[in-house]
């Protein structure tokens, strides 16, 4: 039995009782990485020397009264979250040798909580993708079946947890990039409310949509991690000055009287029968615990995909303009003048999907097209947000599938961008509205790959979605199933 089969609270107790050491936890992580990483390919960079030194330092503090629950816990960090002195590439060749000179706020918070960073995790380049096949280095595989994708863009973050390489990880979610891979890999992934967690030190893809969040084996562990990284940050102008409650206090298993909304659009056209049936089965479980549900409509959700790709690509076009070979990152050797420097550095450094989205965004923002595309997309975004607010006026949570289907095979959709984009039709509206949502395991498809249940909450009401997710988790055994890698 792996140490990572235990929860954070169980491991904390074992540490305090000196049944295990922090070094044991770190070595467990690196041993597992040595055993499976050649197949899974979840990591881009390991930090073994520093992690082992930190473990030795923390071993001397075991038993101290001020040791928090995350003391000594091994974590993986998505490679678009900057880490001081530890290579951060965004899985792009243009940043292949970039060593940041500061830590992201979430990394600072986790260091203050005495977690240990095991390494940086693979992803779709600049977080643009749904399968991890867009990494500029190599594709991560799904631990449940190596012929299948782990999802994206936080595929490395989800795969590392599912494979038992780390206890938990950080991902980022712009249109579903935490929840979709969590669903595909059979783990728990939360996208917090926009502004709940600082984005300072997150390399921007789409600044009005990006949000950092936790990926874990259980809902309880997820709540521990969110508790540690949440809160106002003066270094992030979009960080919200909203009190962070005690997420653990609400994990009572009680959902009696809970009002659940189920959008008909989330069980209709484009959603597979397996995903639909898994949600209906989950609703039956929650009904048996005293919750009620009704069908509702999010009428503008059918426009979410087009709206998202116009807005996110426009923001990416602006954000990625900084990668030009002048200040940092890879610089092309094929340069005769300044224009060559810009053009060749970006042409050689960016992958196809990143170029595709930059081109789309630049077009949408260009003179003569701005009103027809970008401005119109912003107006539709407001309508989508209003749809959520209207539903939440009468219901506590919204529930549906995380993805239309289970994970698909490697190479199956990589040459068809529109089919690939459609994997995110159920997660994208949440980002456009800025509300929080969690994906928890809820069954398996005919291909024996995991399915995820998406629970969506009101702005800054992560406590309620944790309560519902935990109650469902404890009433079922889906979270106890593990990839037999």
UniProtKB/Swiss-Prot annotation:
Keywords: ATP-binding, Ligase, Nucleotide-binding, Protein biosynthesis. GO terms for molecular function: ATP binding; glutaminyl-tRNA synthase (glutamine-hydrolyzing) activity. GO terms for cellular component: glutamyl-tRNA(Gln) amidotransferase complex. The active site is at 78 (charge relay system), 153 (charge relay system), 177 (acyl-ester intermediate). Its EC number is 6.3.5.7. It catalyses: L-glutamyl-tRNA(Gln) + L-glutamine + ATP + H2O = L-glutaminyl-tRNA(Gln) + L-glutamate + ADP + phosphate + H(+). Heterotrimer of A, B and C subunits. HAMAP family: GatA. Belongs to the amidase family. GatA subfamily. This is Glutamyl-tRNA(Gln) amidotransferase subunit A. It comes from Bacillus anthracis. The gene is gatA.
């Amino acid at each position: 039995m792996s140490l990572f089969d235990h929860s954070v609270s169980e491991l904390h107790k074992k540490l305090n009782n000196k049944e295990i050491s922090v070094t044991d936890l770190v070595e467990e992580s690196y041993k597992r990485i040595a055993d499976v990483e050649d197949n899974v390919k979840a990591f881009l960079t390991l930090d073994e020397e520093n992690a082992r030194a930190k473990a030795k330092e923390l071993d001397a503090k075991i038993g101290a009264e001020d040791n928090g629950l995350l003391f000594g816990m091994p974590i993986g960090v998505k490679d678009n979250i900057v880490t001081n002195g530890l290579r951060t590439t965004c899985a792009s060749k243009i940043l292949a040798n970039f060593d940041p000179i500061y830590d992201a706020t979430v990394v600072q918070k986790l260091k203050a909580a005495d977690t240990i960073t095991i390494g940086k995790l693979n992803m779709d380049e600049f977080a643009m993708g749904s399968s991890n096949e867009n990494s500029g280095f190599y594709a991560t595989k799904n631990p449940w079946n190596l012929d299948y994708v782990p999802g994206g863009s936080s595929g490395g973050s989800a795969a590392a947890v599912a494979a038992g390489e780390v206890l938990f990880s950080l991902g980022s979610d712009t249109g579903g990039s935490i929840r979709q891979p969590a669903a595909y890999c059979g783990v728990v992934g939360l996208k917090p409310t926009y502004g709940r967690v600082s984005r300072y030190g997150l390399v921007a893809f789409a600044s009005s949509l990006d949000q950092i969040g936790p990926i874990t084996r259980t809902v309880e562990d997820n709540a521990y991690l969110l508790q540690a990284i949440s809160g106002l940050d003066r270094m992030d102008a979009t960080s919200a000055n909203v009190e962070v409650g005690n997420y653990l206090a609400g994990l009572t298993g009680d959902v009696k009287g809970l009002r659940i909304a189920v959008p008909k659009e989330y069980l209709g056209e484009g959603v597979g029968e397996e995903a639909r049936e898994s949600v209906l089965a989950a609703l039956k479980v929650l009904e048996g615990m005293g919750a009620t549900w009704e069908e509702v409509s999010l009428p503008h959700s059918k426009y979410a995909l087009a709206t998202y790709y116009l807005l996110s690509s426009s923001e990416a076009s602006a954000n990625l303009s900084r990668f030009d070979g002048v200040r940092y990152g890879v610089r092309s050797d094929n340069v005769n003048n300044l224009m060559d420097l810009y053009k060749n550095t970006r042409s050689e450094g960016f992958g196809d999907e990143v170029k595709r989205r930059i081109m789309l965004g630049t077009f949408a923002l260009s003179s003569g097209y701005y009103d027809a595309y970008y401005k119109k997309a912003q107006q539709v975004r407001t309508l989508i947000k209003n749809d959520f607010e209207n539903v939440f006026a009468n219901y506590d949570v919204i529930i549906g599938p995380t993805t239309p289907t289970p994970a698909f095979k490697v190479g199956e959709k990589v040459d068809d961008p529109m089919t690939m984009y459609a994997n995110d039709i159920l997660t994208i509206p949440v980002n456009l509205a800025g509300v929080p949502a969690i994906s928890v395991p809820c069954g398996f498809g005919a291909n024996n790959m995991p399915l995820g249940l998406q629970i969506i909450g009101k702005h800054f009401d992560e406590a309620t979605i944790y309560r519902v997710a935990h109650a469902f988790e404890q009433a079922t055994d889906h979270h106890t199933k593990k990839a037999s890698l």
